[in-house]
Curated annotation (Swiss-Prot):
GO molecular function, a single term: structural constituent of ribosome
A Pfam family it matches: Ribosomal_L34
Keywords attached to this entry: Ribonucleoprotein, Ribosomal protein
HAMAP family for this protein: Ribosomal_bL34
Family recorded in the similarity comment: Belongs to the bacterial ribosomal protein bL34 family.
Name listed for the protein in its UniProt record: Large ribosomal subunit protein bL34
GO-annotated biological processes: translation
GO cellular component: ribonucleoprotein complex; ribosome
Protein species of origin: Anaplasma phagocytophilum (strain HZ)
Xref: InterPro entries: Ribosomal_bL34, Ribosomal_bL34_CS
Top-rank taxon, per record: Bacteria
């Protein structure tokens, strides 16, 4: 059985990147929550 984590920079950015977060209402909520926490890194 292969490992579940098969790294891909393209898939990582498309699924969890800034523009992916901004494209949905819930994604923007995630960003706002992370900003409120004071995170320096908001997303992948």
């Amino acid at each position: 059985m292969k490992r579940t984590f098969q790294p891909s920079r393209i898939v990582r950015k498309r699924r969890h990147g800034f523009r992916a977060r901004m494209s949905t209402k819930w994604g923007r909520r995630i960003l706002n929550r992370r900003r409120a926490q004071g995170r320096s890194i908001l997303c992948a």
